């Protein structure tokens, strides 16, 4: 009964395959959107149930010898508790003898449907009456012994040994290639080295439901801990470890929560410490934090209604809004004492600050919201939610910056009015601004030359940027990954396969699956594909079954049945136990109806066939054809052009793999980010031009963001940074946030050109520095995330905002000074920005 390849029962290992679930933000709503790849992930998990298995490895330490008993005891106990918990459809650590015999009956009693061309002659020989007599005589002396009940039962189920023929070409049940079914008490899922025993369970709900997955894994871990607490179990040294899709789901949810807590805490604490250093009075500090605090609170309230639940990327809005919260209110705090110093009352100073700075604040919030709103148009759902929530947050902060904070300032000053203008300004920042601007005043041409040189050099190297091909959500030290690696090492059960998902009526699905299997077989023979698991090894199409049966059309099965009866009597056997097989031979001799899915389900164990092909609620069928590449890191195991040609030849199907889904997701994010970049750039250009009504002024206002974006990518290239798809997503944010520097500085300069750009830069500089520092801290907190794309966005945005600050505080004054120096006798005509 030996064989090699991928026999039907080896598809039991297919139900074991781990399918890492796509990131979910709720039990029913995919983060990725509605593209075919992502619909396929949902269909595989929900309708087909494919990959929704929980594995539990029962292992013993290396060097232990007699541990079979404790392993079986632990596996039996946990399996029994699973079945009574109400959380699992079925759970098993082996096959019952009757299940094994039913598999034999399924293939032996329907042998015309499974006999291939290369097996036809051997089967005909076994059906020959003379050969039947010889086989029965041999069975009487070799197969049936007082110590071989399985041999006896096997002989009763398949007295002609037809299953042995099918097994030679990978159609037998004996080769559970990953298990040693003969070790221990028998029929158990032991590893080949006998050091591990596997429990395979199918929970009631999909692994893509994070809440249910957490419940299942928590239940499993609790029961394992209770077993570990017992002295007898603890002394045995047996180790029990859950693995598979449900463990990945649980770990990813914990991963999300851990990352959000970490980056939010870093952003909030970092900005709080920064504000404590900068603001001289506690009430002023509290007022500066008010827009961020209320903005986060109100935005969270909106998000609770829509989208209802958020994902890892969109949850980062807490850290980002904590950094953006005081970006505009600091300009009020900076402007009010300056206006008060000109004379008049404090209330007059506040009103003048509103009249001058208020419009700039409004413009800056609108430009930032333009960038986030452009991301909200993304077809990639996670990015769209991120953009939407940030846009809501920006408008919430605008409301509190323009209305709530001034109102509270008025109330505060009724009880504690400042005695001098300088008591409500900043610490340290005016000194830093003066030093920077004085340097620009002394070396304007040097600053411009350095900025232009850096810009040009970065621009030259931009075409060499390459995006990373993939990213991993979890690392090798993650418990889910470690458990999956042990599962692979012990049982050869790999990670996520490539899957062709086929839908339609039953025979259409099976026919297409056979054609695709034949196409994949060529790649397996060339060594590109390691293994193929097709539903048609368990259930061939009716057409294939008829073709195979036709090759046996000349065999007189009625004569074979008579010969079997006679030989049984001649050798002293009772015919009653074998009568079902004899009757089946006679029926097959009269007619051979094709095997159906319902027939297969009656004979095969739960989880064997229904995870390969299943009837869905609307009466159609869904089948999963899975295969593994020889190179585990290969993404295009089968070229896209070949898959497209197969679709034209064989009909529609969905190609699915988490590696491909990863790549498609990155391509989608890149596409959406480029579109958001175009919309943001167009919106910002329009807003800036409508605000200043002068092309030359508009170009000067744009200096910080152009320098910031190009310089960021140039510097990262210089240090050989590996870019990911989220680098492009950061560009609209740099544009929307970095433009604030140019708007505030140039508008202030236009109001008081007679003071000169250096004086204006010194007056505006402290607010520019403070607003950018809090933003850098907010986005910089994302770099603490262990989710690589989020950390990438934090790095690129933080560096971009820092360079945009340099462009605003250094380059804009330097450019204006250089222009003034070129026309000292006609400054009004050359530098008049009106």
Q: What do the predicted segments below correspond to?
A:
Residues 1-25, 407, 411, 415, ...:
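Signature of alpha-helical transmembrane segments and their immediate interfacial
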Residues 14-16, 69-197, 212, 216, ...:
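Alpha-helical transmembrane helix bundles of large polytopic membrane transport and channel proteins
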Residues 16-62, 175-189, 437-441, 445, ...:
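Solvent-exposed, non-transmembrane loop/terminal regulatory segments of multi-pass membrane proteins
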Residues 148-282, 586-684:
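Extracytoplasmic
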Residues 260, 289, 341-378, 702, ...:
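Pore- and gate-forming transmembrane helices of large, multi-pass membrane proteins
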Residues 284-332, 697-745, 780, 810, ...:
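Hydrophobic transmembrane alpha-helices and their membrane-interface caps
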Residues 305, 321-337, 358-377, 382-424, ...:
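Transmembrane alpha-helices and their membrane-interface boundaries in multi-pass membrane transporters
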Residues 444-570:
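Juxtamembrane segments of multi-pass membrane proteins
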